[in-house]
């Protein structure tokens, strides 16, 4: 079952962050053609709310922190009962969480480390197995599961190279490599390298195509959607009529439908859209209320999808103290 999930962060008082913020996870209900809240909880003010859902067991995994913490830890919540567990007790920074074939994966920087790297989380021992604990130079970005290759798609660059005079003062572009990495983290297959532009996000569209959002330089200019032909290594821009900028996206497994967070021409608000590459049909997907900040968009493929019958799981402040 293919499920579209959108992560947003809303101000609890509806106006500003004075009273804190909450993580809200929406799932798109194809039957009603509407977003429905499946999970809501207050989160720490410094947290990047990485999350993923195990729909078979109706459990959400998410990064959060107690009010006095400036670092992340991993939590789980049973969507049926609201039971919350804190699964780690360290100083982490999570960029991505993925649930694939019954296993929880993370892209995470652990305590005393600068860079994020892929890790596999053992739910029984509640411990991480990292790709390479000795490597604190390689940044791993845009961690996603590639259903076509049955491996992970990853974007990497060197922290040391990023800080060189050539990159920091001249090009302002981090040389990056798009690669496949298997579930053991031992076998890596490079697919594409460039330092002609800054790659922000990558996702597999079909057998021979990767889509990516790019910027002319680091944190500079509007994001552009590009298409990479893996075989020929040719790159071309993908223009979406009526859209001035695509910030993040996720393709459907049909190889044609693209879900993305973007800005319409002449607008400043970010919205979620569905776009058909063949017909160029563009549809805005609406929320019950406009989110304060759209953080992430992802598509999961699992044996089952959301169970809307038990409604939304809403946690109060004490959920963070368990």
Regions found by a protein language model. Give the residues of each.
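Surface loop/turn motifs at the tips and blade-to-blade linkers of beta-strand repeat domains
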Residues: 39-44, 87-91, 132-137, 191-196, ...
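Repeated scaffold domains used in trafficking and secretory/extracellular systems
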Residues: 45-52, 92-101, 137-147, 196-204, ...
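Short, conserved, GDST-rich strand-edge loop motifs in beta-rich repeat architectures
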Residues: 4-19, 65-66, 109-110, 156-172, ...
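Short loop/turn segments that connect beta-strands within beta-propeller blades
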Residues: 29-33, 78-82, 122-126, 182-186, ...
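Short coil/turn segments that connect the beta-strands within blades of beta-propeller domains
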Residues: 1-3, 56-58, 101-103, 149-151, ...
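Blade-level signature of beta-propeller repeat domains, shared across WD40, Kelch, NHL, RCC1
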Residues: 271-273, 280-322
């Amino acid at each position: 079952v293919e499920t579209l999930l959108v992560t947003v962060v809303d101000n609890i008082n509806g106006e500003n962050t004075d009273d804190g913020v909450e993580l809200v996870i929406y799932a798109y209900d194809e039957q009603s053609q509407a977003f429905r809240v499946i999970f809501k909880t207050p989160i720490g003010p410094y947290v990047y709310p990485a999350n993923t859902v195990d729909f078979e067991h109706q459990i959400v995994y998410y990064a959060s922190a107690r009010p006095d913490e400036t670092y992340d830890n991993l939590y789980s919540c049973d969507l049926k009962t609201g039971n919350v567990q804190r699964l780690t007790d360290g100083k982490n920074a999570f960029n991505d969480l993925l649930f694939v074939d019954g296993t929880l994966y993370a892209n995470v920087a652990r305590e005393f480390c600068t860079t994020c790297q892929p890790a596999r989380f053992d739910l029984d021992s509640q411990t991480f197995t990292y790709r390479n604990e000795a490597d604190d130079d390689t940044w791993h970005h845009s961690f996603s599961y590639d259903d076509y290759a049955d491996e992970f798609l990853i974007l990497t660059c060197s922290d040391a190279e990023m800080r060189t005079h050539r990159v920091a003062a001249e090009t302002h572009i981090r040389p990056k490599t798009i690669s496949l990495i298997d579930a053991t983290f031992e076998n890596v297959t490079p697919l594409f390298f460039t330092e002609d532009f800054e790659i922000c996000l990558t996702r597999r569209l079909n057998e021979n195509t990767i889509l990516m959002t790019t910027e002319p330089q680091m944190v500079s200019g509007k994001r552009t959607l590009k298409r990479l032909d893996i075989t020929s290594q040719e790159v071309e821009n993908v223009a979406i009529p009526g859209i001035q900028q695509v910030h993040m996206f996720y393709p459907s497994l049909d190889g044609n439908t693209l879900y993305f967070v973007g800005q319409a021409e002449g607008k400043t608000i970010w919205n979620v859209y569905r776009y058909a590459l063949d017909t160029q049909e563009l549809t805005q997907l609406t929320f019950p209320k406009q989110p304060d900040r759209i953080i992430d968009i992802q598509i999961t493929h699992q044996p089952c999808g959301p169970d809307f019958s038990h409604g939304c799981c809403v946690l109060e402040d004490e959920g963070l103290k368990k």
